[in-house]
Structures are given as C-alpha cells and as structure tokens.
C-alpha cells in the first residue's frame, strides 16, 4: 500500500498535457464536453496525474488538478536520474525508462517529458512502445515510476547488506 502524500505540504506546479473535445450526439444536436489531462509535481521527487471532464475547459482543468493532487506518488531519484531501468505498461502502451548520464537531459517526448520534469528527474532516456495516446503514455510512465526501488530497499527485501548488494 502506497503511503499518502499530503499535497498541502508541497509546492506543486501543474502542466496541462492534453485537452480533448468530446461530442455526444443527441436528438436536439450535439452536446460538447471537454476532458483534460494534467500532471502536477514539485520537481523534487513527487508527481501526480489526474483527469477531469466538464462543459468548459477551465472547469475540466480545475477538476483534473484536484484529481492529480489526490494521486501523488514518490519517485526515487539517485543524483539527477532514476535508480535503474524499468518498463511501465498500461493498456496497449509501454514506456521504457533508462537512467542517463548527468547532463544528458530528459530524452522523452510529450507527456513522458512533462512527467519526468515535474518529478524532478533531470537525466533520463525513454522509449515509447505500442499505443502513444497521452493518457496511456502517462499511465504507463506512472506504472514504471511506481516499480522503481532504491538500493537500500532492494537490500532490505533480500535481507543482505548494502555492501554485499554492490558486489
């Protein structure tokens, strides 16, 4: 069970990744609604995403930001990158995340770049496989980020010392 992260104790920035116009055809014509996908993060190891739907764009964004603040995760960061390579999946989308050398920057496109920058990961390489819709990309990225573990956690799970793990 992931521990709750209080969004009120963090200085969160938000970034709108996608806005979709949804049309429902009814007897009297078309009903328009908007769906927004938003990423929030403190650029210091905490990031979340949320979606919101409403009749107007600003209201959809507000709902998405609220949802994102309730859906925060902690990302383990080693220096300026992630601890190890990981493959996140959601639906038909896959995201491969690899640690990168310091100074190489975020090599990722669109939604994945946004997640990494708001999480505070400065150096990472990614490859998007399969479905490339923004929602699938974000959810697959979050799946990958939740799989990340620090060396201390791995050593504790295996019941060995950190020195033994390094060898």
Curated annotation (Swiss-Prot):
Record keyword Transport present: no
GO-annotated cellular components: small ribosomal subunit
InterPro entries for the chain: Ribosomal_Su5_D2-typ_SF, Ribosomal_uS5, Ribosomal_uS5_bac-type, Ribosomal_uS5_C, Ribosomal_uS5_N, Ribosomal_uS5_N_CS, Ribsml_uS5_D2-typ_fold_subgr
Residue ranges that the Swiss-Prot or TrEMBL entry lists as coiled coil: none
Gene Ontology MF terms in the entry: rRNA binding; structural constituent of ribosome
Written domain comment of the UniProt record: The N-terminal domain interacts with the head of the 30S subunit; the C-terminal domain interacts with the body and contacts protein S4. The interaction surface between S4 and S5 is involved in control of translational fidelity.
Name listed for the protein in its UniProt record: Small ribosomal subunit protein uS5
Species lineage: Bacteria, Bacillati, Bacillota, Bacilli, Lactobacillales
């Amino acid at each position: 069970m992931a521990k709750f992260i209080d969004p009120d104790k963090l200085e969160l920035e938000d970034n709108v990744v996608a806005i979709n116009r949804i049309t429902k055809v009814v007897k009297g014509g078309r009903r328009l609604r908007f769906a927004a996908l938003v990423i929030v993060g403190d650029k210091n190891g905490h990031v979340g995403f949320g979606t919101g739907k409403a009749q107007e764009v600003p209201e959809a964004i507000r709902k998405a930001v609220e949802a994102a603040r309730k859906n925060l995760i902690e990302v383990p960061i080693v220096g300026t990158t992630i601890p190890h390579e990981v493959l996140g999946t959601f639906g038909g989308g896959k995201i491969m995340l690899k640690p990168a050398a310091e100074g190489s920057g975020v090599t990722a496109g669109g939604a994945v770049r946004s997640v990494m920058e708001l999480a505070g990961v400065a150096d990472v390489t990614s490859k998007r496989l399969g479905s490339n819709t923004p929602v699938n990309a974000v959810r697959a990225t979050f799946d990958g980020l939740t799989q990340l573990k620090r060396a201390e956690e791995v050593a504790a799970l295996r019941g060995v010392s950190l020195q033994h793990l390094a060898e």
